[in-house]
Amino acid sequence: MKSIRYGVSLIALFALYYLLPLNFRLLWQPDETRYAEISREMLATGDWVVPHFLGLRYFEKPIAGYWINSIGQWLFGHNNFGVRFGSVFAITMTALLVAWLAWRIFRDKRVAIMSPVIFLTAMLVYAIGTYAVLDPMITLWLALAMCSFWGAAQAHSRSGKILGYVLLGVACGMGVMTKGFLALAVPVVGVLPWVIARKRWREVLTYGWLAVIVCTLVVLPWGLAIAQREPDFWRYFFWVEHIQRFAEKDAQHKAPFWYYIPFLIAGSLPWLALLPGALKRGWLERDEARGALYLLGWVAMPFLFFSIAKGKLPTYILPCFAPLSILMARYALEAAKTGAKALRINGMINLGVGLLGLIAVLVVSPWGFMHRPVWTKIELYKCLLAAIAFAVWALMGWLAMKDSGRRWSLAALCPLGLALLVGFAIPDRVIDSKQPQFLVDIVSESLQPSRYVLTNNVGIAGGLAWELKRSDIIMFDKQGELKYGLDWPDAQGSFVSQAGFADWLAAHRQQGPVSLVLLMDKGESMLDLPLPKPDNAYELGRVVFLQYLPQ
């Protein structure tokens, strides 16, 4: 009966975190609107080989992540839940793999249960796991690689080892098809410390070729198909999306070596106090037969790998949290048994985070000290919701601190207020520029019949295309990440320069209404735009809607 009650509680907690809020949060640009539209176009065209965005060639990533996202929209429809379902599905499967690996390594049911709980409630995991990007998918395949290699290494029969390496090849192959050759590098560096320490080179060399063959067989059908359809794909994807992004001096998203440390710290909330002890214990137990060193290798080596790379984004270290959550769960359970101070400190940290959040809400509110508050006076209910969210965090932290020996796991409830309320507390000024669904809904009656729709922002373009269910959105003045696709001869009609807009408008407005949705620079006004006078205009923060009717 007790186990049933715990099971129901965990399912309810998962639903509150990962299912209920999805449809009530507007899509963010540029990432969510981009991936929503790519998958919508895949379903609309039936082309499951070549990724397209706004009808243009879009070779930033391979195809498998788009497949998962497309299945989400196919199953649940054209809504925000369907867009985000792929990420939730991937992160949920990762959590189940975390539970499996925790059980296989430590043979402790409590560790196997708490590991996915810690994983799913860690802030970085939750933020990315409910956000429509491809990182949860690559995390799933890397977690499968981590589990399959361990299963193969611990198997006592030849067939068990073969099965493990076959699964490793499948995981690496799907990883390559999701986010590229990164899926080959991370497993290699992840297992390296354990293989060296345990002197398992002979076994790896004996069976490793099997994983390589299976990986190749997984990638080959689609790899050949897209090479036949789009011969330039592999050149662009390998050189631009791998070499230039990660290694060259002008790499995208350049950041210093220590860039990920703050994200590791903040992303570990509400379990931050467990982080030092978990890593330390993993190191101290490196010589034991259990897999502490194996888990530590999968945390530290990918973290160092991404830190060395010149191009960095917070989402890249998401795979590190799968093994880290197992180390943290084991350390927490041992701390509860021995009465260690770490659990009480964890409660104190969460109490402090909640109180600091409440103070921050007060400071940036209309009655705070900022010259330009985050929320305006008509958004007081949003201030209240934000305050409630942080109050929940503080309350759970306080309860966990008061009885850390028995209630330390209440830390899992700390982010629940944010999870349920953050979508309703986003300031209007942020919604206006970062969540284009809001504007599209306001001007939809004018947008729907438009013959041409133009925008100067790729993220807004994705939002317009997805909301209007049309891929013929035209880029105006700026090309951004669509430059490669726009450079092709068959895409010349998909871009209009600002200098040539007046002539283009004169030639096209008689075919039907022409609508522009433009993101202005900070401090810029609609009156500053060097454009012909529109017939209709609507300004919402930094976003302006202009419409030209036939004359």
UniProtKB/Swiss-Prot annotation:
Described purpose of this protein according to its UniProt entry: Catalyzes the transfer of the L-Ara4N moiety of the glycolipid undecaprenyl phosphate-alpha-L-Ara4N to lipid A. The modified arabinose is attached to lipid A and is required for resistance to polymyxin and cationic antimicrobial peptides.
Enzymatic class: transferase
Protein's recorded name: Undecaprenyl phosphate-alpha-4-amino-4-deoxy-L-arabinose arabinosyl transferase
Reaction(s) catalysed by this chain's protein: 4-amino-4-deoxy-alpha-L-arabinopyranosyl di-trans,octa-cis-undecaprenyl phosphate + lipid IVA = lipid IIA + di-trans,octa-cis-undecaprenyl phosphate
Localization in the cell: Cell inner membrane
Protein family (similarity comment): Belongs to the glycosyltransferase 83 family.
KW Transmembrane (keyword) present: yes
Top-level taxon of origin: Bacteria
Membrane association type: Multi-pass membrane protein
Organism: Klebsiella pneumoniae subsp. pneumoniae (strain ATCC 700721 / MGH 78578)
GO cellular component, as recorded: plasma membrane
EC nos: 2.4.2.43
UniProt key word tRNA processing: no
InterPro entries the UniProt entry points to: ArnT_tfrase, Glyco_trans_39/83, LipidA_mod_glycosyltrf_83
NCBIfam families with a match to the protein in the record: PRK13279.1
Transmembrane domains' residue ranges: 8-28, 85-105, 111-131, 176-196, 207-227, 255-275, 291-311, 313-333, 349-369, 380-400, 408-428
Molecular-function GO terms, alphabetical: 4-amino-4-deoxy-L-arabinose transferase activity; mannosyltransferase activity
Keywords annotated in UniProt: Cell inner membrane, Cell membrane, Glycosyltransferase, Lipid A biosynthesis, Lipid biosynthesis, Lipid metabolism, Lipopolysaccharide biosynthesis, Membrane, Transferase, Transmembrane, Transmembrane helix
One biological process term in Gene Ontology: lipid A biosynthetic process
